[in-house]
């Protein structure tokens, strides 16, 4: 290679790349050592753009081993990328990523393909192929790009067809994990006015993760992508581009790499707050653990022998193995991952004459996704269930042949369907678990999977489509004034988005409890539907349009002012609900939601349901206030803009200062009971962004520097409440520095470096409960595990009375045990509060109980004598703590990267060894911070050596990534209390190495 050049753009000091420019600009006369970008929607030298932008052309992507999005983030300062829990991903720029979780959330980082915005794209899943360039813009970009993005824009530019002549290339690669990859393209001119380009890739490899349960490999890849493009130039000044792209993946990709837990022996929390460890949560703390316990069954007057266990006894994960290796698991559920994406684009660019240009473009996108994975990444101990399964078989059998009653004197017809669905071969045979089907009938409708171990897994699926149209008129006058004006209109439609959690224990509870509920209310044999958790967005429609423009005023050859403005209008309507054991469903039903006993189901707790209950006669949605779905509409309209002043000190040195105001629309939270005090909606977020920068060339050294300060209002943050992701708003301050240096001592030797510093903090008071510690570090509090739903609440003393609050909980539990609470039977035998183990990170005590009864007792329902001196408060969502001053997630304090290569001439050949070193500092995985939420710093070293033939017509390459095989964590997710408070972690890929050969024609 004849010299290396910088790749970082602007002030934002990005990453360094090699000399090249986008193919769209190929007709222009430019220095071959310059990068041409379209950051301001026109072709400009990278070093002339007063925006924080980084660009990677095809050669840079290859040399720096940037094969996918995870690789891309390593080469950029103040940028991180991580997969997230629900099939999504978060690209974080300067501390701001997709901290909002939900179908109505907009992305903080806008992803564009050829300048067109994408929604829920799977570009993050696949491999990069036949790209002309990737441009990364930092900071709000609403006055130039599509939909709003408060953190920035990543614009993937595909290689366009060339009318200059026929061309083709092919590359074949083989690596460890039996990885086989192929990619290539062919370009064919069609006369003098058109050309066609077809490109594609294919990747197949074995899994990264060993499953010791059955000695198999999981987390493999089997994917391909294909793209066809047409360029037509019918006459001078007219360019028409058409493109269609398809991506498909079907394999056993895992959405998470590891699940971690410091096991809680008390069962109140499941996992403790002291550290992340290679243990498994205590199953007694889960929704299944409490609702199938002898203690809960006792409060309902059900036979203790039918309970799957005791909250104080051996739990279903006793003996479960969680290997202390990020690439080794023990799971009895094979993950599945199936996704496809269509993208169709068209644009026409017309020179209008007189220095004016018009560009009109449209984009259509369709995404389907279906993924399933073991929910707890562990194997349950079925021996714990043995007694209950034998009892179920007893209840399902007639006392004597032909007798309609069982040995307990109850009708067999109510229990036989449960046993037939879940233990078809008897209590010692296969155990069957519901499949997550839309009908909601699960195993009781014949939709089941059966195995020797109790299953628990989740499923995430979605179907969405979107389209957008954009028009831009820009000027290129010779005088001191130019402008750009444009508009965009887009529609997004989500027709299905569901998250399911399925477990044998849920099936058992919904079958057994449903049988007794139906029997006691005179209903026919029934189960509780749905026999799995389903958070379902049935329909989401988003309509948005924006009008934007910029004016460029040159006061002199050196001084230029840019002023931009944008009007934003967003409308969102969502139809959603969650179901889990919500209503009786008669056996034999083909659609659980068509039950005749669903009148008491209420999908919208914000309205008052006159007849709450799981067995009310009537169809779902037939009673006023008891809605079948929560339906909400929100609308937002805002003005944003920017101002930039740049000054060219010399032709090789520029400084600039900018102010921009960014906006991201608000949205709608899923339906939750009012007791959790979560707003139906969340507000838009705004950022006032200030930036100064300098771009400099000093002969063979290039130095770019940037400083920035962000003032955020109503930044959107997600947390889990009652098994559901909800979003809050906080204020935040962010500031940082970025530097990048490129040194070319000779034309053969090139060195690039970049470094960044980032400070983030919540800047205003915001009180939220930490899901890992509902007692908020208080010794005068008791954390409660509610045996009626698996949630946690907390009881806190109003006067610091430690003994008093513990005595209060013990007294209320004794009242429950005695059967003195209306609607509850005696015999629960709930125990007194107990301390958590040493090193747990929990100062409070813990106990099993019933939060609703504790709230009533605190209000005097059982007399003033129960309430201790000073009084107590019951916190349904935990005791809130002030998160002011806490760091934002996914924002490392420091990042550093350096690369060196030497292109050694060998006659007609060139041998180029290269090495890259990357350091990413520590960050936090969620807003509550602390050691347990820390994402450790990590380093990665990559290396390769490439031999290029004459005129680079062929090459052979040997490469290695992650040389030292680091288990680098990029993000984490803390689950709900009813699931056990475990932590899912996401990592970079392990060490990979291989060889590749390629040819150009």
What are these model-derived regions, one by one?
Residues 1-64, 70-76, 344, 999:
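N-terminal Sec signal peptide and the immediately downstream disordered periplasmic leader
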Residues 51-99, 109-128, 133-142, 159:
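Periplasmic N-terminal accessory/gating domains of Gram-negative outer-membrane beta-barrel systems
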Residues 64, 106-108, 120, 129-138, ...:
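Outer-membrane beta-barrel translocator/receptor signature
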Residues 215, 221-483, 490-493, 702-704:
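Outer-membrane beta-barrel domain signature, strongest for Gram-negative TonB-dependent receptors
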Residues 233, 473-476, 482-492, 538-710:
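Structural signature of Gram-negative outer-membrane beta-barrels, strongest in the C-terminal barrel
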Residues 349-353, 357-363, 370-373, 498, ...:
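Membrane-embedded beta-barrel scaffold of Gram-negative outer-membrane proteins
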Residues 709-711, 728-927, 996-1000:
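Gram-negative outer-membrane beta-barrel transporters
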Residues 760, 918-926, 947-1001:
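C-terminal beta-signal and adjacent terminal beta-strands/loops
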